[in-house]
Amino acid sequence: MNTCFLVLDYHVLNGRAEQTALIYDSPVTGKKKSYTYKQLTNEVARTAGMLAEMGVVKGDRVIIYMPMIPEAVMAMLACARLGAVHSVVFGGFAANELAIRIEDAEPKVIMAASCGIEVKKIIPYLPMVNKAIKDSRWKPEKVVVYQREECPAELNSNPGVDGRDVDWSQQLAKSNPHDCVPVDACDPLYVLYTSGTTGKPKGVVREHGGHAVAMKYSMSVIYNAKPGEVYWAASDVGWVVGHSYIVYAPLIHGCTTILYEGKPVRTPDPAAFWRVCQEHDVNILFSAPTAFRAIKKEDPEGELIKQYPMPALRTIFMAGERLDPPTLQWVEEKTKRPVVDHWWQTETGWAISGNPLGLEEFPLKPGSSTMPTPGFDVQVLDETGSPVAANEQGFIVIQLPLPPGCLATVWRNHDRFQSGYLTQFPGYYVSGDGGYIDEDGYLFVMGRIDDVINVAGHRLSTGEMEEILGGHNDVAECAVIGAHDALKGQIPYGFVVLKDGHYSVDGNIEKELLQKVREEIGAVASFRNVMIVNRLPKTRSGKVLRR
């Protein structure tokens, strides 16, 4: 088998060659472009040929550090075509986070863009790639750079890297198309790093076969999507939603997918989502609750929604963080469309629970992600591993075996896979979330039970932030907690105790700490609050009390 064949070649051979596969819509650059299945297949085949000519073969790792542009999708699918293992790193991560992933994945090649483009801001990528490689013990053989006209990068400008950097477009022009390489169903398709409780990100390994089955099944059962329809997951390819529901699932299912380089607001206004839905005849929209809270904040009466009838839009799905009932009710009231909450994780790759519209639609219960998806035996246990009664909170677990598509292991660290997910309650996968199941079988997910917080749908480790704060010369002790935020769901809040005789003058230490977290994790952490305190609250055993 080959996942790229299922995504592209299969449809070209079975009557969808001229159907639009990918729509690129970039309000930050003003560019739009569409690719048919045939056109996208040709581009991916040539990109695979380019990688093959650099020596990339089945099993090699390729890190992709790119913004939301078509070439990012082409890079992912080109790796799949060759049987190489891609590891996409979110473009908002700083050089330190990229370096950690380079060292763990050991890529033969890094594929990057010259820059990312945010609202009124351009972020050069190559300087971060250069720093990450410098800081990592592993050195890739090549760095392929896609030059964006908004900010071209100077290649091979760093000492000692002569010939390492390759111009993407120039190399592609000389490359020949490459056929799909057969792989086994259990071969790794990709490694995607997610925040772990130890601070060090863990590489979730996804296999070709089970992943393809889960993607196809979920499009029918969860989203009730039909081949040929337009599916838009307003996320980023650097996250699991982007992997599963921008790239793989819609295309495996024969849908048209949208790649949106913009924001829910400020590109140019809170009508951005509605404009895309109207213009591209979107049938199914999927995003995080944070996006809709941002829209609600700037257009509380929903006046801009009225300007876009969106006749094709059938259903709005939300996931990535807890969907608060007021946001759900506001979106349903203003859009006149049903909102479906569903819950899943980077580790599973698809919905653990949701409303299976393609099988049977269940009545809505605000605050609940409805029922466990077929294949997931979801239970709630107490600290001893015993099942709890209905409506009683506990640890949300999944009885083994896990269904197709879930993580097979942690990259090069199977012991961490076992200890992190399978040891606490033998026979069960531990989700890391707490919640309860009511008397009707509805699942309510209430939040994390470890040190991972959810900032605007992005999983981040407070432990990793504490390591950074604790590394400051003036800091004796520190703690980071997740605080409620009306827009982002949670934001990190830091508390530090200074060493005796050390003092902050005009907030200099606080500023240094904020900058240090931004440099090492990135702006995605939204770390903007740190307070110097005399002491931290402790439990009787001497552990920092976080509540």
Predicted features and spans:
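Conserved ATP/PPi-binding loop(s) of AMP-dependent carboxylate-activating enzymes
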Residues: 371-375, 386-421, 460
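Gly/Ser/Thr-rich phosphate-binding loop
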Residues: 255, 283-287, 296-363, 377, ...
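Conserved beta-loop-beta connector loops within the AMP-binding
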Residues: 379-400, 439-440, 503-510, 545
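Conserved AMP-binding/adenylation subdomain of ANL enzymes
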Residues: 212-230, 240-284, 297-303
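Structural core segment of the AMP-binding/adenylate-forming
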Residues: 77, 81-170, 288-289
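AMP-binding/adenylate-forming catalytic domain of the ANL superfamily
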Residues: 142-145, 487-490, 519-544
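AMP-binding/adenylate-forming catalytic core of the ANL superfamily
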Residues: 89-115, 129, 278, 285, ...
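Conserved pre-ATP/AMP-binding loop-to-beta segment of ANL
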Residues: 18-20, 143-151, 156-193, 200, ...
